[in-house]
Amino acid sequence: MSTLFVADIHLCAQEPAITAGFLHFLRTRAIAAQALYILGDLFEVWIGDDDPNPLHHEIAVALQALTQRGIPCYFIHGNRDFLLGKRYAAACGITLLPAQRVMQLDELRVVILHGDTLCTDDNDYQRFRRRVHQRWLQRLFLSLPLQLRLRIADRMRANSLRANAGKTADIMDINAQAVMAVMDDTGATVMIHGHTHRPAIHQLPGERRRAVLGAWHHQGSAIEVSTSGVMLHEFSFGG
């Protein structure tokens, strides 16, 4: 059996086609897998496990159905949903993982992560990331009224869009030295990540590979690891 990896689905109520496509993926492709790993940005925004958004319940039910069939599901936080907590994970039946995880899949030593920590040339983003990952600041934010959290999140997203519009594509992409440092430190032969929305499988020195997941904007994207190797799949939301 194969292990599946996805990232950057960016689920939100404003994009029902993406939601339908992801639910179809869970019922068809994921149900035939040995395990499913979601490498961040499952949701476009996450302001707390107490958000009563009906979409969150719908996704929790679908993921719970998958795990109840004996297919484990694991989650690494992204830059959009880094506040997703234990309460929602329990509702989904998924297991929360640290920001970086090393695993052995058959003969492959694989390191998985969301990918934003590899974009070390984007100094502004890395400073922002360090700030919002401070525990005290997260606790303060989650203590605010829900509607205030939503307004803050909307403002932060708008600021991010404006900031990214002034950055070059190279700055927002991964840093090759950062990639090699992670692979050297972990001894991994394969790296799988998302975040950049640039799906591809890159050959690296020393017979190593970096597999990048695509975003679920107009089609689905998944990486499959099996005895046949590492494969990138892109498919229609109904396929």
From Swiss-Prot:
Alphabetized CDD domains for the sequence: MPP_YbbF-LpxH
Amino acids binding Mn(2+) 2: 41, 79, 114, 195
Pathway membership: Glycolipid biosynthesis; lipid IV(A) biosynthesis; lipid IV(A) from (3R)-3-hydroxytetradecanoyl-[acyl-carrier-protein] and UDP-N-acetyl-alpha-D-glucosamine: step 4/6
The protein's enzyme class: hydrolase
Binding-site residues, Mn(2+) 1: 8, 10, 41, 197
Annotated cofactor note: Binds 2 Mn(2+) ions per subunit in a binuclear metal center.
Bilayer topology term: Peripheral membrane protein
Cofactors, names only: Mn(2+)
Role according to the record: Hydrolyzes the pyrophosphate bond of UDP-2,3-diacylglucosamine to yield 2,3-diacylglucosamine 1-phosphate (lipid X) and UMP by catalyzing the attack of water at the alpha-P atom. Involved in the biosynthesis of lipid A, a phosphorylated glycolipid that anchors the lipopolysaccharide to the outer membrane of the cell.
Name recorded for this polypeptide: UDP-2,3-diacylglucosamine hydrolase
This protein's encoding gene: lpxH
